[in-house]
Structures are given as structure tokens and as C-alpha cells.
Amino acid sequence: MSRHSRLQRQVLSLYRELLRAGRGKPGAEARVRAEFRQHACLPRSDVLRIEYLYRRGRRQLQMLRSGHATAMGAFVRTRGPTEESNGAGAPGTLSGEGDDPRKPLDSMRTPKTPLDGR
């Protein structure tokens, strides 16, 4: 087995630190494991995303260690009737939202009024 890269060692260290910091806090260990499992399939070549998630994890670790956190959880958004069911697009985005980066305000459509003014 090859040696881990520096970034891999940092991520593994962060994982262990988060598990230690989450001991005694309801839901923390399960949340840490779930978050790391969710992103385990990221390709090694996606360094920017891995570094972003690493920094985000570092901030969460600081919050857990600060003493202000008593538990750890997550907000889960359920699918609405207007969301795509095939999983296309980013998670949590509505269908048609952000399809064209040149028109960012198109998703904020205003209702059309009839020509007769009613």
C-alpha cells in the first residue's frame, strides 16, 4: 500500500479529532461519520473541493471545541413537488434553477398579469 499524501493525512487527522471532540455530544459522532462517508467517493484529483471540505471541517471542529456546542445535528431538506426526482443537478436545488449562469435572476420569476389588467 502506498503512503498517504499530505492532504490525506490531514483529512484523516481531522476525522480523528472530530470524533474525539464529539464524544459526549449527542449526535456528533454519527454526524461526523455520515459526513465523511458521504464525501468518501470524491476523486483524489478534486483537490479544490477536498480542501474546501477540510477547511469547513476545521471550522466545525473549532465550534465543537469552543464549549458553546452541546449537540451536533443537520438540517435535512425534503424534496418538494417542484424538485427533480431523477437526482440531476445539485442536491437541494429546484428544477430549472440556475440552468443558465448568464441569467441568474430568471429563477425569480414574477407572476404574469393578464393584458386586460385584472
UniProtKB/Swiss-Prot annotation:
GO biological process: mitochondrial respiratory chain complex II assembly
Annotated region described as Interaction with SDHB, given as residue ranges: 53-65
Function: Plays an essential role in the assembly of succinate dehydrogenase (SDH), an enzyme complex (also referred to as respiratory complex II) that is a component of both the tricarboxylic acid (TCA) cycle and the mitochondrial electron transport chain, and which couples the oxidation of succinate to fumarate with the reduction of ubiquinone (coenzyme Q) to ubiquinol. Promotes maturation of the iron-sulfur protein subunit SDHB of the SDH catalytic dimer, protecting it from the deleterious effects of oxidants. May act together with SDHAF3.
Signal peptide annotation: none
Key words, A-Z: Chaperone, Mitochondrion, Repeat
Quaternary organization: Interacts with SDHB within an SDHA-SDHB subcomplex. Also interacts with the iron-sulfur transfer complex formed by HSC20, HSPA9 and ISCU through direct binding to HSC20. Binding of SDHAF1 to SDHB precedes and is necessary for recruitment of the iron-sulfur transfer complex by SDHAF1.
Protein name: Succinate dehydrogenase assembly factor 1, mitochondrial
Domain of life the protein comes from: Eukaryota
Main location: mitochondrion
Ranges for region Disordered: 72-118
GO CC field: mitochondrial matrix; mitochondrion
Annotated compartments: Mitochondrion matrix
Motif stretch (LYR motif 2): 53-55
Position of sequence motif LYR motif 1: 14-16
Record keyword Repeat present: yes
Coiled coil: none
Family statement: Belongs to the complex I LYR family. SDHAF1 subfamily.
